[in-house]
């Protein structure tokens, strides 16, 4: 029989009980982790979000409670009244925080029964992730999942406390806004009362937080929900959370210093990490040159080395032609990997090809010098210079790519990370934060034949570069910055444009004419005419930051109800079909249904 809690009020959480509670009568509530019969006694491990405690039922002391306990099964929901006592000598469980005590149950109420779960509710069980997502309410009962969400809560609280102490106001911005160009595709929401018109869910609160600066709010933050209808790459979510920050009357150093303080405090309070400050800074160009990435993992070496000057006059045409055509020749030193087999090197070549490298040249360094099919094309002086540049020693494997700078960076940067993981060069439990600064404002899209904003079109150019917007847009430098942790971008921001004339020049440079700018961003441009202060800010990816600090492998493990890589919710089966009547109210017809009807009619 299902019972109610009338008269029983929880006094303690299961995981709180210790030896000092011995002799105390307590009321506990929770789920049955397991039930065991031993020598006329029934032992129930009762679990709540704080932990597990053992409850003992004896027929000699409380027969009614004992009889109920016989009917209990895993995941039943119980309320128990009993007395805390030290466990008998030799029966303590060192694996439990409550392992020195147990509760002698005198009253038991079965508040709800449970079917047999499709997987064990405990850590360390190998369960298919789709099954976990289908039964997310069961998956979230597991201690490691509950700990992850508690960790996330504490991280959010740390951020809120820090920003509140530094004069920030938490202000909510609209979830229903208008669609704007640039960036990923918007999630669109049809307006019933405005037929044929659509809202968009925000990809970020960017424009609203800038307008809050125009409004004189001075310091704003929000732990904001954002939405992007993009093709999901590994470990992305269509809806995500970011720590959104904006400040008036600041420069780059002000934003970076405040962010470092917030992140360092979060790491200390939530993860117990002492992060040194200030964070190192790398220019965008230096990051690309040394690591082949604008989000470098600096926990290990194996940096890219440029040998273009040496290779330009060599007899190996692949190298010499690449340099002559404006390309580069760069390499990495896989120290100690000179024993790699030809197949292993071929596998590395195939890996680099994924990033458009046309080939992977290699030198195996030995005591005599270099073993390579291409060494004959180099003079002794050239080989010696290459070995010195690469800091090569006998037993090393040198890997080279000759191509356009972007291909060299992408392929060697990815190969560096691949080898770093494969060779165990990346230390566990270390956290390297750094800033990447001095980005170009724009990048050229070869396919569309136009410039695009590298970050977003509201990023301020350096004042000295503003004249270049009309004459040489590719040379304009941005007041932008990215925060990188262990090779993952966890945040990005900039000083913003606060003058209408500069904003219009940037729009023109990226192919947005005055008419389109007025239609899409007229409200922002008009706001800039009413006394806009200089301002800047940053947005940190909260899901990813929590994942990295919690030591998880995927952001899905720090989000309560994540979507799959195909943007579906396996628990609710969203997205799903809607009734024709709902579509009519929204003045929408689905093309798929029309096409199906046409196909059937054509038969």
Swiss-Prot record:
Site-annotated residues for Important for tRNA non-discrimination: 38, 90
GO terms for cellular component: cytoplasm
Protein name: Aspartate--tRNA(Asp/Asn) ligase
Keywords: Aminoacyl-tRNA synthetase, ATP-binding, Cytoplasm, Ligase, Nucleotide-binding, Protein biosynthesis
Region (Aspartate): 206-209
Top-rank EC class of the record's enzyme: ligase
Residues that bind L-aspartate: 182, 228, 455, 496
UniProt GO MF annotations: aspartate-tRNA ligase activity; aspartate-tRNA(Asn) ligase activity; ATP binding; catalytic activity, acting on a protein; nucleic acid binding; transferase activity
Chain's role: Aspartyl-tRNA synthetase with relaxed tRNA specificity since it is able to aspartylate not only its cognate tRNA(Asp) but also tRNA(Asn). Reaction proceeds in two steps: L-aspartate is first activated by ATP to form Asp-AMP and then transferred to the acceptor end of tRNA(Asp/Asn).
Listed GO biological process terms: aspartyl-tRNA aminoacylation
E.C. code: 6.1.1.23
InterPro entries: Aa-tRNA-synt_II, aa-tRNA-synth_II, aa-tRNA-synth_II/BPL/LPL, Asp-tRNA-ligase_1, Asp-tRNA-ligase_1_N, Asp/Asn-tRNA-synth_IIb, AspRS_core, GAD-like_sf
Cellular localization per UniProt: Cytoplasm
PANTHER family reported in the protein's UniProt record: ASPARTATE--TRNA LIGASE, MITOCHONDRIAL (PTHR22594:SF5), ASPARTYL/LYSYL-TRNA SYNTHETASE (PTHR22594)
Sequence positions that bind ATP: 228-230, 237, 489, 541-544
Catalytic reaction(s) noted: tRNA(Asx) + L-aspartate + ATP = L-aspartyl-tRNA(Asx) + AMP + diphosphate
Family: Belongs to the class-II aminoacyl-tRNA synthetase family. Type 1 subfamily.
Assembly and interaction partners: Homodimer.
């Amino acid at each position: 029989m299902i019972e109610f809690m009338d008269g029983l009020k929880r006094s303690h959480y299961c995981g709180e009980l210790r030896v000092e509670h011995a002799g105390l009568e307590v009321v506990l509530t929770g789920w049955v982790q397991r039930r065991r019969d031993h020598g006329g006694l029934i032992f129930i491990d009762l679990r709540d979000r704080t932990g597990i405690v053992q409850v003992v039922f004896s027929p000699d002391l409380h027969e009614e409670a004992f009889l109920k306990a016989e009917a209990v099964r895993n995941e039943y929901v119980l309320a128990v009244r009993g007395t805390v006592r030290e466990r008998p000598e030799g029966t303590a469980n060192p694996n439990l925080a409550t392992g020195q005590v147990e509760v002698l149950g005198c009253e038991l109420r079965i508040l709800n029964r449970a079917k047999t779960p499709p997987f064990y509710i405990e850590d360390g069980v190998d369960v298919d992730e789709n099954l976990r997502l289908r039964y997310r309410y069961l998956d979230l009962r597991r201690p490691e999942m509950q700990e992850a969400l508690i960790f996330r809560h504490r991280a959010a609280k740390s951020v809120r406390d820090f920003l509140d102490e530094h004069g920030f106001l938490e202000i909510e911005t609209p979830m229903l806004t208008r669609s704007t160009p640039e960036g990923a595709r918007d999630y669109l929401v049809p307006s019933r009362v405005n037929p044929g018109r659509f809202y968009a869910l925000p990809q970020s609160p960017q424009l609203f937080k800038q307008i809050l600066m125009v409004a004189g709010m001075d310091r704003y933050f929000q732990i904001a929900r954002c939405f992007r209808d993009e093709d999901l790459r590994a470990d992305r979510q269509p809806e995500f959370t970011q720590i959104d920050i904006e400040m008036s009357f600041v420069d780059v150093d002000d934003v970076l210093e405040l962010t470092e303080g917030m992140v360092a405090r979060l790491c200390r309070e939530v993860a117990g990490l002492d992060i040194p400050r200030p964070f190192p800074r790398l220019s965008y160009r230096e990051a690309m040159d040394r690591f082949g990435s604008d989000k470098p993992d600096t926990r290990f070496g194996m940096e890219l080395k440029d040998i273009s000057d040496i290779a330009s006059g060599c007899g190996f045409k692949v190298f010499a032609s690449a340099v002559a055509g404006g390309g580069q020749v760069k390499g990495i030193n896989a120290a100690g990997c000179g024993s790699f087999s030809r197949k292993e090197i071929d596998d590395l070549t195939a890996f680099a090809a994924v990033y458009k490298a046309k080939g992977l040249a290699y030198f195996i360094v030995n005591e005599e010098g270099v073993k390579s099919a291409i060494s004959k094309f180099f003079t002794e002086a050239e080989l010696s210079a290459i070995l010195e540049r690469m800091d090569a020693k006998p037993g090393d494997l040198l890997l080279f790519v000759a191509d356009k700078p972007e291909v060299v960076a992408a392929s060697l940067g990815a190969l560096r990370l691949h080898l770093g993981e494969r060779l165990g060069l990346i230390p566990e439990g270390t956290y390297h934060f750094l800033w990447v600064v001095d980005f170009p404002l724009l990048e050229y899209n070869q396919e569309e034949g136009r410039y695009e904003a590298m970050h977003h079109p509201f990023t301020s150019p350096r004042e000295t570069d503003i004249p270049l917007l009309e004459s040489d847009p590719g040379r304009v430098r941005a007041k932008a910055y990215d925060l990188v942790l262990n090779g993952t971008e966890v945040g990005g921001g900039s000083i913003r444009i606060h003058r209408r004339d500069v904003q219009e020049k940037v729009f023109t440079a990226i192919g947005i004419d005055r008419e389109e700018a007025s239609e899409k961003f007229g409200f922002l441009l008009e706001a800039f005419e009413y006394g806009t202060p200089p301002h800047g800010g940053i947005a940190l990816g909260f899901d990813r930051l929590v994942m990295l600090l919690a030591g998880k492998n995927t952001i899905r493990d720090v989000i309560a109800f994540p979507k799959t890589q195909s943007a579906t919710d396996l628990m609710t089966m969203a997205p799903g079909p809607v009734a024709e009547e709902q579509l009519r109210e929204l003045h929408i017809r689905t093309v798929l249904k029309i096409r199906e009807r046409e196909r059937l009619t054509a038969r």
